[in-house]
């Protein structure tokens, strides 16, 4: 079956969050099951630099407002770093910018993001309409708000052609990021005027790309079963809960997986020493090396907490800031890798300066350091307000770094709380309910108590490391879904 994945970023060439990890891992997993998978991505410089054997498929003629001065071309080639065949939209005026993929150097969204990512959705739909005369997908799978207009453009093309072109699947990676734009930009997109209403993209006087994906896709997925239920309620529905309840029969949750080729302590070239769940001596070496690298007191008996995250309120990082003084006083160490809210960055930096042998902070993102940090820590904190799936807790499980998570979304689907009655059965981490510093502190203190009981700690650690969170099962679920929408 021919599958087209439409996404804005792909690991390892371009990554701002977990979307890139999924986009990089799902196509090879589907191919291993016999699917013929290609991706379509914007021509950001990092992606173009990774494209080999490129040929020009077409000169693009999208709706007039999307056309920039130098036009746009669709290239086809291979992204060896991602192990996938790819269509790349080569349009420098759209995608070659001084800032990041979505925001400028001052972290302000680009004024023409509706054009930049409308073009991505349009190209995905046109590929189902014969843009490449030698290959057309049976299913178009669009990811997050950036590609969300693909199902809308596909529906419009099918109406114009009077026949079905392809099935469509739309995946919500985070409902909070919807791709909102002023209503007057709708006319730039070249969609039928009838789509600019409540049964379409219109959202309280604006347009929402994500709403377009949710409304027009044949099937909708989220990245965990619990999140699929949560977003149908007002608290986490972000104003779209009514639409999601209406489409409940078409909505399902499929957990993200961990790419074993990237995240595997048994063969990870980015960590000081490899290890397995049966032989954990290498993890102790990773911890000692990390403590030395960060200037922390080199003591194996001190539990080391880590965070790898965007610094936002949604991720619960303000709770970490509130909890850390008490946790450090109670004998924990802490290390963070992340960036985001400027105020939080300053607060974490100040805390590390106040406790130089107990806390360390690195702002930004460094993939190699993320591996060293997770491998060398004892516990990884994911205290999110809401969490569609979460990947860092899965990396923690894989590396024997027990997760401390809040009972929401994909976190509750992937981490089983360690309590006396569960230690011998399914415990893999520590789960708390209250979205508060006290809730986080309580879970960390429970973790420290278990850390002191070495045999019980090892039992939970090894159980976590053997959890089956690879991509094969998730890919099978997606393939079954594709078969349904292609029928």
Curated annotation (Swiss-Prot):
> What EC identifiers does the entry list?
2.4.1.21
UniProt entry keywords in alphabetical sequence: Glycogen biosynthesis, Glycosyltransferase, Transferase
Catalytic reaction annotation: [(1->4)-alpha-D-glucosyl](n) + ADP-alpha-D-glucose = [(1->4)-alpha-D-glucosyl](n+1) + ADP + H(+)
| Enzyme class name | transferase
User: Does the keyword Coiled coil belong to this entry?
Assistant: no
Origin: domain of life: Bacteria
Gene Ontology MF annotations: alpha-1,4-glucan glucosyltransferase (ADP-glucose donor) activity; alpha-1,4-glucan glucosyltransferase (UDP-glucose donor) activity
Residues of the signal peptide: none
Pathway this chain belongs to: Glycan biosynthesis; glycogen biosynthesis
Read off the InterPro entries from this record: Glyco_trans_1 (IPR001296), GS/SS (IPR011835), Starch_synth_cat_dom (IPR013534)
The answer on whether this UniProt entry bears the keyword Lipid metabolism reads no
All disulfide bonds of the chain are none
According to its UniProt entry, one GO biological process term is: glycogen biosynthetic process
**GO CC term (a single one):** cytosol
Provide the residue positions that the database annotates as binding ADP-alpha-D-glucose. Answer: 15
**Family per record:** Belongs to the glycosyltransferase 1 family. Bacterial/plant glycogen synthase subfamily.
Record function comment? Synthesizes alpha-1,4-glucan chains using ADP-glucose.
Protein's name according to its UniProt entry = Glycogen synthase
* UniProt source species: Leptothrix cholodnii (strain ATCC 51168 / LMG 8142 / SP-6) (Leptothrix discophora (strain SP-6))
Q: What gene is this protein translated from?
A: glgA
């Amino acid at each position: 079956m021919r599958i087209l994945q439409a996404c804005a970023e792909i690991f390892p060439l371009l990554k701002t969050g977990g979307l890139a990890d999924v986009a990089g891992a799902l196509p090879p997993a589907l191919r291993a099951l016999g699917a013929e998978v290609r991706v379509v991505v914007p021509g950001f410089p990092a992606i173009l630099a990774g494209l080999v054997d490129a040929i020009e498929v077409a000169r693009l003629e999208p709706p007039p407002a999307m056309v920039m001065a130098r036009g746009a071309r669709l290239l086809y080639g291979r992204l060896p770093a991602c192990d996938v065949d790819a269509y790349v939209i080569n349009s420098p005026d759209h995608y070659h910018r001084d800032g990041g993929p979505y925001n400028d150097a001052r972290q302000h969204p680009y004024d023409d993001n509706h054009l930049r990512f409308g073009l991505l959705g349009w190209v995905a739909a046109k590929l189902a309409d014969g843009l490449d005369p030698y290959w057309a997908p049976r299913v178009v799978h669009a990811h997050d708000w950036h590609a969300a207009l693909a199902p809308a453009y596909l529906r419009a093309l099918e109406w114009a052609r009077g026949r079905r072109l392809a099935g469509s699947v739309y995946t919500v990676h985070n409902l909070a990021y919807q791709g909102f734009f002023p209503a007057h930009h709708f006319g730039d997109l070249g969609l039928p005027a009838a789509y600019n209403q409540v049964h379409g993209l219109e959202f309280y006087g604006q347009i929402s790309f994500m709403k377009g994906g949710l409304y027009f896709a044949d099937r909708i997925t989220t990245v965990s079963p619990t999140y699929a239920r949560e977003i149908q309620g007002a608290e986490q529905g972000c104003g779209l809960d009514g639409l999601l309840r209406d489409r409940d029969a078409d909505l399902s949750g499929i957990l993200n997986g961990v790419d074993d080729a990237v995240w595997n302590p048994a063969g990870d070239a980015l960590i000081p020493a490899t290890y397995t769940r049966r032989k954990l001596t290498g993890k102790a070496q990773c911890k000692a090396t990390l403590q030395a690298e960060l200037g922390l007191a080199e003591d194996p008996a001190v539990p080391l907490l880590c965070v790898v995250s965007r610094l936002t309120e949604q991720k619960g990082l303000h709770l970490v800031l509130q909890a850390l003084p008490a946790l450090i006083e109670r004998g924990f160490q802490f290390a963070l890798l992340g960036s985001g809210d400027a105020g939080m960055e300053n607060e974490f930096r100040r805390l590390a300066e106040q406790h130089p042998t107990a806390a360390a902070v690195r702002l930004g993102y460094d993939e190699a350091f993320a591996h060293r940090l997770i491998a060398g820590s004892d516990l990884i904190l994911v205290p999110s307000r809401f969490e569609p799936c979460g990947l860092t807790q899965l990396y923690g499980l894989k590396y024997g770094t027990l997760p401390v998570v809040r009972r929401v979304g994909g976190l509750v689907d992937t981490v089983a709380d360690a309590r006396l009655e569960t230690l011998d059965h399914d415990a893999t981490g520590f789960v708390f309910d209250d979205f508060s510093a006290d809730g986080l502190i309580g879970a960390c203190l429970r973790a420290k108590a278990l850390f002191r009981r070495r045999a019980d700690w090892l039992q939970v650690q090894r159980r976590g490391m053997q959890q089956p969170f690879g991509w094969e099962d998730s890919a099978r679920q997606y393939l079954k879904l594709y078969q349904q929408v292609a029928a």
